[in-house]
Amino acid sequence: MSDRKQALDMALRHIEKQFGKGSIMKLGEQAEQRVSTVSSGTLALDIALGVGGYPKGRVIEVYGPESSGKTTVALHAIAEVQRNGGQAAFIDAEHALDPVYASKLGVNIDELLLSQPDTGEQALEIAEALVRSGALDIIVIDSVAALVPKAEIEGEMGDSHVGLQARLMSQALRKLSGAINKSKTIAIFINQIREKVGVMFGNPETTPGGRALKFYSSVRLEVRRAEALKQGNEIVGNRTKIKVVKNKVAPPFRLAEVDIMYGEGISREGSMLDIASELDIVEKSGAWYSYKGDRLGQGRENSKQFLKENPEITAEIERLIRDHHGLDGEAKLEEAAEEQAFEDVPLDLK
């Protein structure tokens, strides 16, 4: 063995002794090299994300205009995690979460941890404590724009607090990012949009909270309403576009189009019908939709209703779509393996 190799082995042993097992290793020695994911709860978005869902242990930013469906997207992710036996938390900085609507989306509100903090510092400290516990699978912060620094709350209405929120987010993400990765928690930050003053060329839109969140996010989703969905003269929902504007785990700039129905959330059947039609799993002839020669219905809304009333056909079509895109179905939460990995590398290293 060469002197260089001996020196390296000695250094590695010293590092492991000082900082714990797993603090340094060769990249190929990692047990899980493939990105571990949890379904977003929406088939179209799972496909757009490229890996079948949200990557575990990563920061996700969901932003867009008001009432575009940002919180709905996050609540569907919570419902999916809970359905697979995971633990979820919701930091409601906007104090606007509707428990009735959340339960209609499939969220188990009896098991959902909810915090409605007074200040931005309190919200992020609660988030850090929950993540460092290692017992959480997903945490949603709604929203970054509502994380008001303590100094601003205690100050007068006209006081200027330049860059205070940006510094708060930058410090919080420096502390949170390592813990999020080690505990395999999915951290979803919901954000609003603002317009930069005096921009003549290019997009004037930006997100509040500084640049830190843009850098730390592995996935950034832009949610926008495209058009209203009508039944007769009544508006029953919105056609919504979700664009993956940043993606560190798969190619970015993919687009998912979904139907967000009022009081119901994202229409699973609508997404499935659109994707299945594109792949010719479901045949479309004029206004009629057919599957294996059997007619589903005339028009998109009637076909959606047929799929809703026949879950076995819906499940069969979903399986064919997932097989075509190479998605492994629903990612189960590997609790035992994660707990072991979590014990090997303690989180409260200061």
From Swiss-Prot:
It comes from the Bacteria. Signal peptide: none annotated. It is found in: Cytoplasm. SUPFAM superfamilies: P-loop containing nucleoside triphosphate hydrolases, RecA protein, C-terminal domain. InterPro entries: AAA+_ATPase, DNA_recomb/repair_RecA, DNA_recomb/repair_RecA_CS, P-loop_NTPase, RecA-like_C, RecA-like_N, RecA_ATP-bd, RecA_C_sf. Disulfide bonds: none annotated. SMART domains: AAA (SM00382). Its main location: cytoplasm. The keyword DNA-binding applies. ATP binds at G64, P65, E66, S67, S68, G69, K70, T71. Keywords: ATP-binding, Cytoplasm, DNA damage, DNA recombination, DNA repair, DNA-binding, Nucleotide-binding, SOS response. Gene3D superfamilies: P-loop containing nucleotide triphosphate hydrolases. One of its GO terms (biological process) is DNA recombination. GO terms for cellular component: cytosol. GO terms for molecular function: ATP binding; ATP hydrolysis activity; ATP-dependent DNA damage sensor activity; damaged DNA binding; single-stranded DNA binding. Can catalyze the hydrolysis of ATP in the presence of single-stranded DNA, the ATP-dependent uptake of single-stranded DNA by duplex DNA, and the ATP-dependent hybridization of homologous single-stranded DNAs. It interacts with LexA causing its activation and leading to its autocatalytic cleavage. HAMAP family: RecA (MF_00268). Belongs to the RecA family. This is Protein RecA. It comes from Shouchella clausii (strain KSM-K16) (Alkalihalobacillus clausii).
